Every structure is written in C-alpha cells, then in structure tokens.
Swiss-Prot record:
HAMAP family: GTPase_EngB. Mg(2+) binds at residues 39, 61. GTP binds at residues 32-39, 59-63, 77-80, 144-147, 178-180. GO terms for molecular function: GTP binding; metal ion binding. Transmembrane segments: none annotated. This is Probable GTP-binding protein EngB. Residues 24-199 form the EngB-type G domain. One of its GO terms (biological process) is division septum assembly. The keyword Nucleotide-binding applies. The keyword Nucleotide-binding applies. Keywords: Cell cycle, Cell division, GTP-binding, Magnesium, Metal-binding, Nucleotide-binding, Septation. The gene is engB.
Length: 207
C-alpha cells in the first residue's frame, strides 16, 4: 500500500466544478488552515519532497489540486484558509465551491483535517468536520507539528481533541498526532488513507 501512495503525481487543478475529474472512483480530501502543515503532511505521506508545494505565504492554494495515485484514485488538496490577501468575492467563490464539492461529490470517501497541534479545532476545522459529518463520511484529525511539544503535552492535547470531536460528531472522527519532520504517525495516516482509497484491499489481494 505504501508503495502505491508513493506513486502519487499531480493530475490537475480545478478552479470550478466544471474542471473537476469525472465523479467516479475514490478520493480523499485534505483540508487545513494556513500554516497548519497540510502540504508538508502530503509530502511526508507520499515520500515526495515537492508533491504539494510548501508555500511561504499562507492561504495561497486557490484551487482543488488532484494528485493521482492510480486511475480513479486521488488525493485532493483543498484550498487553504487563512490570511491570504485576496478579495472577498474570491473568498466567497472558494467557499461556495468547497460547499458544493462536499455536498455532491460521490467519489469523496474521507476527509483529513490538518491542524497544528498547538492550535487545534478552530472554527474552520470544525466546519470541515461538520461537512464530513453531514455527508456521513469518515474524517481524521491530523495534529501536525507534534515535535514542537513534549510527549506529555502531545498526549494531553490528543485526548482533549478526541473528547471534543466525539462529543460533537460521534465516532465518525478519529484523531492522531503527526510530525512530518520526524515522520511520527506517517504509517498510521497511510493506513487510514489507503483504506479509504481501497488500496489495502488491492495490496492484500496482490500479496
């Protein structure tokens, strides 16, 4: 499964619904606030240094970016949210596009919400988790930059976030700590994403 995920390659960028790939197969979306570490997480997941561009200017992802692993198997990088200097009407366009994507995309099988472990569960994070809950989709909270905290603080934050998401969304949301720098939690994330993409079944059959 890990080797399959490492085959991910840039496929296309969609600025509107007409530019999306055909709605079939399997997609796992990644969402995160600016500077949460979403691009770094995607790069670590796929063992590629520049699959998802790590921007020095937060909030500059202005489209849905599709990375193809196999035909009809995609990782989807959702527009970042933060303090990018863009017009309000463009912000509104992104919001409407994302809303439509979540409500209508049949290929979407799961959502990873990337959060800085030092600043988890902001309004945007809860909104994204809410989208998944409304669709009945599984979601996974990825607490990034775990290496910035000691082990005790990591576990304390992890338990606090787990308790909060369970109270809001039930058992449809799982949570883990993660560090692209130390590769902490990479295998756990791969297992979850691979299962959502149906890669675990194919790998087992091949073995």
């Amino acid at each position: 499964m890990s080797l399959l995920i490492e085959q991910a390659r840039y496929h296309l960028s969609a600025h509107n619904a007409r530019q999306l790939p055909d709605d079939g197969g399997y997609e796992v979306a990644f969402a995160g606030r600016s500077n949460a570490g979403k691009s770094s997480a995607l790069n670590a997941l796929t063992r590629q240094n520049a699959l998802a561009r790590v921007s020095k200017t937060p909030g500059r992802t202005q489209q849905l970016v599709f990375f193809q692993i196999q035909p009809e198997r995609y990782l989807v990088d959702l527009p970042g949210y933060g303090y990018a200097k863009v017009p309000q009407d463009l912000q509104a366009h992104w919001q409407a596009f994302i809303d439509r994507y979540f409500r209508t995309r049949e290929a979407l099988r799961g959502l990873v919400v990337v959060m800085d472990i030092r600043h988890p569960l902001k309004d945007y994070d809860l909104q994204m988790l809410g989208y998944a809950a409304e669709r009945g989709l599984p979601a996974h909270g990825l607490l990034t930059k775990a290496d910035k905290l000691g082990r005790g603080q990591q576990m304390q934050t992890l338990q606090k976030v787990k308790k909060e998401v369970t109270s809001r969304f039930g058992d449809s949301v799982t949570v883990q700590t993660y560090s692209g720098e130390s590769r902490q939690g990479v295998d756990e994330l791969r297992a979850i994403v691979g299962a959502w993409l149906g890669l675990d079944v194919e790998t087992t059959a091949a073995e």
